[in-house]
């Protein structure tokens, strides 16, 4: 799949007789789900929201507004693009889209520790999954490790230079 694509939700079971579906949001931006918003599935079929109930997380798509048609969407994953995400989702100061963080170099005191390969969210905070730099792997360090996305470990994120400056992450690597 195209690297410009962002997974945003999975469509769940039908609710009621009018074609409403349970929407399992996988993004941090529920505001993107609104009347008229356009998404697509893995076959590039367009899905336009006709109605959305944020409290109940129920969605009704245009052209799928009866039970039989809606059933064809159950268990589908829906996507958007990075461009549309940037347009429709507003970030606060010092916030970043996960897709912008993935692929950045992790640097501590001038040493490249690795590259962010994934981000895992848990109840407490996000964890950066780091693929350890080949030089460190050759020196006997683990192939990967996690860094909590917390102020005490993250000094700065610079998208222009493609780096996350960290502190204390080398200790995490050493003890992984």
Curated annotation (Swiss-Prot):
User: Under the cellular component aspect of Gene Ontology, which terms does the record hold?
Assistant: cytoplasm; ribosome
| Gene Ontology terms, MF aspect | ribosome binding
Q: Which residues form the PRC barrel domain?
A: 93-172
One GO process term, biological-process aspect? ribosomal small subunit biogenesis
Q: What is its main location?
A: cytoplasm
Any idea where this protein resides? Cytoplasm
Q: Which domain of life is it from?
A: Bacteria
Entry keyword set: Chaperone, Cytoplasm, Ribosome biogenesis, rRNA processing
| Record bears the keyword Plastid | no
Q: Please describe what this protein does.
A: An accessory protein needed during the final step in the assembly of 30S ribosomal subunit, possibly for assembly of the head region. Essential for efficient processing of 16S rRNA. May be needed both before and after RbfA during the maturation of 16S rRNA. It has affinity for free ribosomal 30S subunits but not for 70S ribosomes.
Q: What is known of its domains?
A: The PRC barrel domain binds ribosomal protein uS19.
Q: How does it assemble?
A: Binds ribosomal protein uS19.
Protein name as it appears in the record? Ribosome maturation factor RimM
